[in-house]
Curated annotation (Swiss-Prot):
Keywords from the UniProt entry: Cell inner membrane, Cell membrane, Ion transport, Membrane, NAD, Sodium, Sodium transport, Translocase, Transmembrane, Transmembrane helix, Transport, Ubiquinone
GO CC aspect terms: plasma membrane
Subunit structure: Composed of six subunits; NqrA, NqrB, NqrC, NqrD, NqrE and NqrF.
Name the record gives this protein: Na(+)-translocating NADH-quinone reductase subunit D
Domain of life of the organism encoding this protein: Bacteria
Gene name per UniProt: nqrD
Similarity comment: family membership: Belongs to the NqrDE/RnfAE family.
GO biological process: sodium ion transport
Subcellular location: Cell inner membrane
Amino acid sequence: MSSAQNIKKSILAPVLDNNPIALQVLGVCSALAVTTKLETAFVMTLAVTFVTALSNFFVSLIRNHIPNSVRIIVQMAIIASLVIVVDQILKAYLYDISKQLSVFVGLIITNCIVMGRAEAFAMKSAPVPSLIDGIGNGLGYGFVLITVGFFRELFGSGKLFGMEVLPLVNNGGWYQPNGLMLLAPSAFFLIGFMIWAIRTFKPEQVEAKE
């Protein structure tokens, strides 16, 4: 398999074939919390992709010099440093969105997707493939976030990226916003529906009966 095909597979596989949320059921908590608006879902996607990609890269770069007994601590130190950079950038340039994301930017440090890829892939692979793997898993995470955020904001407030898409009753239109879509349980059900849809079209992802 060529290098280009390997890169394509590493980036696209986590989106549907091995999605970190839909298949591995990781990172669900933040997916419930930051998807009330498409813009927060999009920014969170960029943040997690940035942290996952670079943490993978740096962990892989020094993997042969990390004592096995402290590898988790080293990984968390690298991830935490990158999260602090992301948090400071958001506060400097996207302060309103930073306030909306609240503690969930800081909680990227404990995100199972980020920690999982650093431990399972970056510790055993070269830096560039690890970087690409991080990008792919960040995009897989973002695919679910953006899809859920799209439906929650559209049907919850009739808007996308804060701009009115469905004419609201309050403004003389026909659409009555569904407040239920702005509550966390709606995200839970939407993610469940996505998992069902993906496994319907990809039955090989269904767990075998014991």
